[in-house]
A protein has these predicted regions:
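Intrinsic-disorder/low-complexity loop/linker signature
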Residues: 138-139, 301-302, 371
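ER/Golgi luminal nucleotide-sugar-dependent glycosyltransferases, focusing on the catalytic module
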Residues: 357
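Sequence-specific dsDNA recognition surfaces
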Residues: 368-383
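Single conserved hydrophobic/aromatic residue that forms the stacking wall/gate
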Residues: 385-398
Length: 398
């Protein structure tokens, strides 16, 4: 009976019954190079004005191509969106792939993988490519870049250690072209309407996890400097707290009114099920021409909360939308806050090792070692202490 079923029917049945997306099945190489699930890619694309996909002039760039999933999903939307503009399907595909989609691969391996995803061939000039280029790269380039080390042994662009990344030609340098040039605009020599990516997150500094050096901020900053109409990237959410070289990045991001959308996953596994990334993950939309308050969505423990907020409203970034109304209520009471009477470290100029003496003095000192005494003259920052009676100063807690 099976012999009587045509190959076409079997093929059609297979497509309907089982048609997995291979890019959703790939394992991540490491926490440095995280592959983006197609579902997340499309959520990011949904944030963009959809008319971008109906214009034959919109140019898209992924400056950190891994699997090619961003360019592939954009191509799908353009092929559908330009149907009325360029009716002939092959002409439409040729135009889109040659004039609208561009990428910079992060390694030689990912350049081959991404061309296979987009062009159906790892070489864009092969007979198997869905559109023919004169060169093997097509519009997905990979250029082997060396780090530029200074006298201290650190790369001037990304801070990589010379002892760890000054390697032989047989190994990857992880010197990504997008952030290892003074003139990224010259890579393709054109302006882009949309820059979209999931950049490498960190470089190992002979530690791992939280101790590794973050580099994703350099991809964001470089993209901003090129002033595309829209920028969207998915990055670790650790920048909310700063530290590890992220303080200035945190400040500029929270102050940037062009960050009009953030989707925040407190647990990174809700977004990338196969990685362990402390601090969560987020993706954002930067809109060059329409600065506004940010529509911020927080996702934790299956709870989804969205509020339109000013990101730098408080000195500390408040991650949970549910806390905003509580903070406003507390502030409205105009009462003295704990921060006015509690110091994080050495608030009176006293060392944390100070225990005082057992002999009674003017000031009582409470510490982890018990109760001691200290003369008034031995307190460097006496002005911080409220003395109600000159002869009997109030005791202080330390």
């Amino acid at each position: 009976m099976a012999d009587n079923i045509s190959t076409g029917i079997l093929s059609g049945l297979y497509e309907k019954v089982y048609n997995p997306d291979v890019l959703s099945c790939l394992a991540n190489l490491s926490n440095d190079e995280v592959f983006t699930p197609p579902e997340i890619v499309n959520k990011m694309l949904d944030m963009l004005p959809q008319e971008l996909f109906s214009s034959p002039d919109t140019k898209f760039l992924d400056p950190a191509v891994k699997t090619g999933v961003y360019l592939r999903e954009i191509a799908k939307r353009l092929i559908k969106g330009l149907e009325a503009v360029i009716p002939d399907r092959q002409q439409r595909i040729d135009h889109i792939f040659k004039n609208q989609l561009y990428g910079i691969a992060i390694t030689e391996l990912t350049s081959l993988l991404s061309r296979r995803s987009l062009y159906c061939s790892k070489y864009a000039n092969s007979a198997f490519s869905v559109t023919h280029f004169e060169n093997s790269d097509g519009n997905i380039r990979f250029k082997r870049i060396h780090h530029s080390f200074d006298k201290s042994g650190r790369c001037i662009f990304c801070g990589a250690s010379e002892t760890q990344y000054d390697r032989g030609e047989e190994r990857e340098y992880y010197a990504y072209e997008w952030i290892h040039t003074l003139h990224p605009e010259e890579i393709f020599g054109m302006k882009f309407d949309v820059i979209i990516s999931n950049p490498p997150y960190q470089l190992s500094d002979e530690g791992n996890g939280a101790s590794a050096k973050p580099i994703y901020q350099y991809f964001v900053e470089t993209a901003k400097n090129l002033k595309p109409r829209f920028l969207t990237m998915i990055i670790p959410a650790r920048w909310y707290a700063g530290g590890k070289g992220l303080d200035e990045f945190r400040k500029t991001m929270l102050e940037d009114k062009r960050i009009v959308r953030i989707v925040d996953y407190v647990n990174a596994k809700d977004c990338f099920s196969s990685i362990n990334l402390g601090g969560g993950i987020c993706y954002f939309l930067w809109d060059r021409d329409n600065p506004n308050k940010c529509q911020y969505t927080n996702i934790h423990d299956s709870v989804v909360s969205t509020e339109t907020r000013t990101l730098n409203e408080f000195p500390v970034f408040v991650r949970y939308n549910e806390a905003i109304s509580i903070i406003h209520k507390v502030i409205s009471q105009k009462e003295r806050t704990v921060s006015e009477v509690v110091g994080s470290r050495n608030p009176f100029g006293l060392s944390s090792f100070e225990r005082g003496t057992k002999e009674p003095q003017e000031i009582k000192l409470f510490s982890s070692g018990g109760t001691g005494y200290i003369p008034v003259d031995d307190i460097p920052q006496l002005s911080l202490i409220h003395i109600s009676e000159p002869t009997r100063p109030e005791p202080i807690s330390y």
